[in-house]
């Protein structure tokens, strides 16, 4: 009996929402509640609902049922405040300051050692570190003729592989920047810093 009452409570707002869906402007909150109703209502492949089935149980969280009991008009009234709160949350999540360090080298052990030095310097100043992220290796292939004049079939193929790493330092302090400036990185590593 409890199963049919839950599915009836889920189906009745769904039919009301479909009847009043002539407006083209829909909010994110109403769409998410509509998707929630669809996921909570069991359906067969033919599209018929299983609300009359006696051996099927539907479970829902209490918070989901409270969302479904509210009327669609209340979603439209509160949509402006929810959009503002989402924008405020995204501003808080994005760091205001970030140092992006991109390292390039032809030799992998050299670039790995440089990454370790940068990460150790940032950790000592309690800065948050993201990385090192290995970027795709760039291969430049050069084709050179073996002979100086003829015999174009005989060639040498040389390649240069450029390995890259990316490190982000979030919320840097002045002490973090000072410790990064004092690092003595090897000469075979190209360092590009963006603030």
UniProtKB/Swiss-Prot annotation:
Signal sequence residues: none
Entry superkingdom: Eukaryota
Single GO molecular function: RNA binding
A Pfam family annotated for this UniProt entry: Ribosomal_S10
Feature: transit peptide: 1-59
Compartments reported by the entry: Plastid, Chloroplast
Transmembrane segments: none
The entry's keywords: Chloroplast, Plastid, Ribonucleoprotein, Ribosomal protein, Transit peptide
Annotated GO CC locations: chloroplast; mitochondrion; small ribosomal subunit
GO annotation terms (biological process): translation
Cited InterPro entries: Ribosomal_uS10, Ribosomal_uS10_CS, Ribosomal_uS10_dom, Ribosomal_uS10_dom_sf
Chief localisation class: plastid
Gene3D superfamilies: Ribosomal protein S10 domain
More details: 2 different forms exist, S10 alpha and S10 beta, possibly due to different transit peptide cleavage.
Subunit annotation: Component of the chloroplast small ribosomal subunit (SSU). Mature 70S chloroplast ribosomes of higher plants consist of a small (30S) and a large (50S) subunit. The 30S small subunit contains 1 molecule of ribosomal RNA (16S rRNA) and 24 different proteins. The 50S large subunit contains 3 rRNA molecules (23S, 5S and 4.5S rRNA) and 33 different proteins.
Protein family membership: Belongs to the universal ribosomal protein uS10 family.
General function of this protein: Component of the chloroplast ribosome (chloro-ribosome), a dedicated translation machinery responsible for the synthesis of chloroplast genome-encoded proteins, including proteins of the transcription and translation machinery and components of the photosynthetic apparatus.
Name recorded for this polypeptide: Small ribosomal subunit protein uS10c
Species in which this protein is naturally found: Spinacia oleracea
Underlying gene: RPS10
